[in-house]
Each structure stands twice: as C-alpha cells, then as structure tokens.
C-alpha cells in the first residue's frame, strides 16, 4: 500500500477527528496547541483515557505508547495518584501563593534519588527548567556561549532551538541549523554544536571555546532513546571539569525512565546542574532545575532584591541576584501527584523495565519474520523502532532508518488500536501488562500483513 492509500483508509476510520480538526484550524494555528501534536493528514482527537487505553471521539480505543511524550509512566488515572490528588483538592486550596511543606518534601525525595542535586528550584515545564539552568550557568560563570549536542532537544526557545532535527557540516564539526523562524542571528554564534558520542572531536571544540563557554547542555540519552557511550560520558565530565565549563544534564525525558535516578544514576556521573520534568509531574506541568549548592544559591533572594517591591525602587539590589519566579512554581497539587507517582515507581520500576524488554524482544521477532531490517534502540523504559542495519551510536546514524516504511506501519497500527505519533519513540508504563503486550503483537502482525 502507498501512504496515500493508507491515509484514505485513515480518513474513513476517523471522520469525527477529521471534522474536529477542520473546526480547530479556524481558531488555532494548524489546529493544534503545540506543533509536535500535529501529523498528516490530521491528528486523532481523544476524549478520555483509563489505564493503558486512550479513547477517541469516533469510539475507538488504543493502547497508548505515546504516554503524552513520556510523562504517563503509570498510564491514565492511576488509582494511588488520583486518590492523593483528591485529598489535596479536599484541603480547599488548590494554590497558596506561599511556601508550603510539600516543596521541601519533594526536594528531599529528589535529593535522595539524584545525589548530584544539593538544592533545587521548581518550574512549570522541562523547557522552563533548561532555560533557567542556562541563566544559572551564565550568572555563575560570567560567560554566555553554550555547547549543545547535535540532535538534542531542550525546549522551544531561541538559544537551544538549533540542530535538533537537521544535520549540516562535517559530522565531527556540525554547523548550527535554526529549527524555527524568529531566531536571532547571534544565537548561531553563541551556540556551539558538538558531535554526540565523539569524545575526541567534542573535546577539541570545547578546548577552542573554553574561555567563552558557560556550559554544555545535553540529553544523556539522545531524544530519550539513543544512549551515550560510557566512554563519552566519562570523558565529557572530565573535560568540562578541567576546562571550567558547567555540565548540564537535561533529564526531562530520562528522569525516572532510564532509572529511578535518571541517566546520571545509570552512568554514575554527577553533572553540575540537572533538569527534570515529564514523569515528575505525573501528567501535570512541572519542571525542576537542581544541582550544586554554590550555583543554586545565586538565586537566593536578598533584602532589597524583590523586583516587585516598590519600596526598593531607589536602592534595589535585584541585579545582584539571579531572578527566578513563577506563580505556579511548586504547585501543591502537582507536587502531591508527583510524590505519589514516585512512591509507586519505587515499587514498580523494575517491572516496567521488564515489560519494556519483553515488548522490544517481541517486536524484533515480528520484524524478523517479515525479513525487514529492524532494531529497537533504547534504555530503561523507552525505546524506538529503527528500520536499519546500521549500528546506532550517533545522531546521523538515526537518519539511515527507513522512516517511510515505519510511517506506513504506524498509520496502519493506529487503525489496529495502537496509539503513537508516527515514527515517535515508545514509552512503556506500569499498566502495559502481558495481555496488553499480546494485543500489541497481534496488532503489529495484522498491520504488517497490509504492507
């Protein structure tokens, strides 16, 4: 089948989603609240979820492997999380606007699981966390360039929205490629692109820019599923420390998914700063930036540093403090849900990893039966399906995959009850039990017969 033929079946399969999309595009650009939620010819519209299942507006149900791009590691509506949230709601105040005990309670739990984090601040998303981590690096070092790994994503703001999906230049000396309109030209000069899993080339570039580089920010597992080598991680930690460059781990995707202690627990490496999000918020918007006390204390408020205190207007010391604020930072309902999620994961994490391994092995066998080159690439509870024989180590290796065939399979899978955005990574949850895996394998066999 051609992709166009598959799309015709898909349109007939989901007429209400199509209609809702046509209405949405009249008032929302592209019909979606975030660009990542769109796919051709239109995305499915959901109305509910329970456990491993998503329910769409046309009456179909799907095993959910998108997990909202990773946060839903317990699936939809996990009882212990719902119960904790309802108790918090019954307190009568959703939001205080003041400090509260849950802030320190969550911070202590995160410190326990992530020993590199001595202190932390809360944000409202992973994007906010990475943005604030870079401001911290600038404030601490007095330098304003950063190193960013090719193919790594750290949010939708200007300095890091370079070379995420695009590759240009020598493989050992990538060029910065803008991934959006509206990026200031100087961002290309201030963001140095580094080759992932190439320690020698990365070291050479860092040594060239050491006097002007504040930090290297990276996903220890590229796009959440392609792991760095231990050699690269050990070497990068050594060279950044030697050159006085801060090392920032963006663990928004890997936190609580590669291991309970994230990728840094898996690799046994302590970064200077860590960014968390996704799983930590249990499906609600939350982020964390944490790390060394001497760096975090740059954000501690001083008398006279409140930018909103008019009485300090003539003697403000705001410029002496790293400003950080947010109405919803440390939201009590979200911290409640996050603490409940961590409590479940401390009992269930090994099970989820085991189910992930079973799913990967079963899918590899199905593709082998069809004689289609395929490998699952991942670590912990996340992986992706790449249709290539090339060993996946670097960002540009991923581009050898047959994404055209993978996309056809994914659309056919939607019509067999398996939900993921076409070509996206798989995020496994605590509710993907053996029956769900068997359903998945059968759906794959049905879909691939139609190819």
Language model feature labels by segment:
Residues 1-451:
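Conserved N-terminal phosphate-binding loop of PLP-dependent enzymes in the Aspartate aminotransferase
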